[in-house]
Structure formats: structure tokens, C-alpha cells
């Protein structure tokens, strides 16, 4: 695992956690300049998903422990804020719930918070990885490639969203993602599903803000209310992580929930 730091260390710290199978630069590169105006910004690059090291993603809890140790060693055990994109929301939830470090503001970025028993997680992983791994590494089959190309060329709002979302996933970036192993992807996908983040999380001194993408459906709102005792639900009439695709608006909303003045 690597953690990349940007900006003035005297400013409040915010740590960003990428989504499933995402590369840190394509996931968050477009928001770093805006964040650095207000925050000492740190971006997590998970084991097995960083191009500067030869490593394997073992499990979600293994990565959480590494992050906890980093925060203890480098940041006196405290973060002002943490943002979790999709999968990253599970990391933020675990870090808060385990209480080995303290986070003032935990921000959940329209995470699906899917949970499954280990047997089902393994089954879903066995189904998904043969399709998803070639897609991420740029070796997708003709059929899968055509499906995504069709969705991105429909000429409507959904196709524009899909195009931008694919950029966050690294598609079209020109980056060779062959450094990501199938084992890392499998372990990340499976352990995220079968690692419980807990229920009704309520930690003194911590506020949990949820960027709820309304177009995902009401069942996700119910999941957030089950996971967190008293979440600050920030509702947007958007799709999964669509807010993050608009860098200026996203930075504005992050600052707003953290009580920091930022003008669009």
C-alpha cells in the first residue's frame, strides 16, 4: 500500500479511499487541486493496485490495519476527514467503527454497502471476476466491450454519465493496468462483500455524512440508516458517484459538510 500526500500539512487532513478496482490517480486526480486549497490531502493506493510496488491485496481488514498504523505514526492517530468512494465507504466505516484512530468527519460516497455470507461472496466473485478483470486491464472480450460502447454512445444523460464514470475507472487513460493481478482483484471484491462494517455506528466526536445518490434507489438509504445510528444524509438526484464526476461541486460539498467555506 502507498499513501500519497499533497498540500500544506498545517491544514486539516482529509484521506481519500478509491472505489473497487480503481487506480488512485484516475479516481481522484481531478479533485486534488481543489481540495488542496483547504486540506492536507492524502490518497490511499491499495496494495495490488499501485503501479510503483509489487504487492497483492490480501483482504479489506489487512488494508484497514495498514491505514490505521499510518494514521497513528504520521498523523497522531487523528484525521479531520475521510472520503470513501464506493468500496472506499466500507474502509471509512471500518476505520470509524473500530475506534483505533479518530475521524471527525466520515464521508460515504454513495457506497452500495453490499454484504454477503462468505459462501455467497465467493460465488459472486467467481461470476464477476472473469468479466471484470479483462475489462479493467484492457483485455475485455468483444461482447463486453460492445455493451459498454453502446451504452456510452446512446447520446443521452446516462451515456454522458457512463463516459465520465469510465474515466474514473481508468478507461481511455492510456495507463497499462496489467500490474493489477487477478488475485488482488478477486480478494478485494470478495472480502469487501463478506467483511461486516457493523450496524448503527455511533462514535462520540465523529459525524458521518452520506452522499446519497437518489437514483440508486431507496434500499440504499435504508442500508445507510442501518449501518449508521444518526447519519447526515445529503441527498442528490444523481447516480452512483455521479457527484464525484463534477470536481468543483464535489469539492464544494465536501467542504460544506466539514464546515469549511468554499465558493463555487
What is the meaning of each model-derived region?
Residues 4-53:
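Conserved HGGG/HGGXW glycine-rich cap/lid loop of the alpha/beta-hydrolase fold
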Residues 229-264:
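Catalytic active-site module of serine/aspartate enzymes centered on a nucleophile-bearing elbow/loop
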Residues 33, 207-241:
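Conserved loop-alpha-helix segment in the C-terminal half of the alpha/beta-hydrolase fold
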Residues 97, 105-137:
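Flexible "cap/lid" loop of the alpha/beta hydrolase fold
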Residues 82-84, 109:
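Short beta-strand immediately N-terminal to the catalytic nucleophile in serine-hydrolase-like folds
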Residues 42-81:
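Active-site loop/oxyanion-hole signature of alpha/beta-hydrolase fold enzymes
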Residues 179-223:
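Conserved serine/cysteine hydrolase catalytic core
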Residues 84-92:
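Gly/Ala-rich beta-loop-alpha elbow adjacent to hydrolase catalytic centers
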Amino acid at each position: 500500500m502507498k499513501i500519497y500526500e499533497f498540500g500544506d500539512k498545517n491544514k486539516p487532513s482529509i484521506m481519500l479511499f478509491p472505489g473497487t478496482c480503481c487506480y488512485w490517480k484516475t479516481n481522484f486526480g481531478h479533485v486534488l487541486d481543489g481540495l488542496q486549497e483547504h486540506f492536507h490531502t492524502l490518497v490511499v493506493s491499495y496494495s495490488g493496485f499501485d503501479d510503483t510496488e509489487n504487492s497483492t491485496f490480501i483482504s479489506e481488514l489487512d488494508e484497514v490495519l495498514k491505514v490505521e498504523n499510518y494514521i497513528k505514526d504520521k498523523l497522531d492517530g487523528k484525521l479531520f476527514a475521510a472520503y470513501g468512494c464506493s468500496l472506499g465507504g466500507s474502509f471509512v466505516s471500518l476505520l470509524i467503527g473500530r475506534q483505533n484512530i479518530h475521524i471527525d468527519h466520515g464521508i460515504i460516497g454513495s457506497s452500495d454497502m453490499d454484504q454477503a455470507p462468505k459462501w455467497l461472496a465467493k460465488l459472486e466473485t467467481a461470476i464477476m471476476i472473469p468479466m471484470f478483470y479483462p475489462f479493467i486491464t484492457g483485455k475485455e472480450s468483444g461482447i463486453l466491450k460492445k455493451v459498454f460502447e453502446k451504452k456510452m454512445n446512446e447520446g443521452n444523460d446516462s451515456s454522458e454519465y457512463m463516459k465520465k464514470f469510465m474515466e474514473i475507472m481508468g478507461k481511455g487513460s492510456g495507463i497499462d493496468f496489467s500490474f493489477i493481478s487477478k488475485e488482488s482483484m478477486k480478494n478485494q471484491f470478495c472480502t469487501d462483500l463478506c467483511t461486516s462494517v457493523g450496524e448503527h455506528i455511533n462514535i462520540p466526536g465523529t459525524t458521518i455524512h452520506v452522499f446519497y445518490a437518489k437514483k440508486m434507489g431507496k434500499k440504499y438509504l435504508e442500508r445507510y440508516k442501518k449501518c449508521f445510528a444518526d447519519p447526515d444524509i445529503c441527498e442528490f438526484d444523481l447516480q452512483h458517484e455521479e457527484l464525484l464526476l463534477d470536481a468543483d461541486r464535489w469539492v464544494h460539498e465536501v467542504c460544506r459538510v466539514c464546515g469549511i467555506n468554499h465558493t463555487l
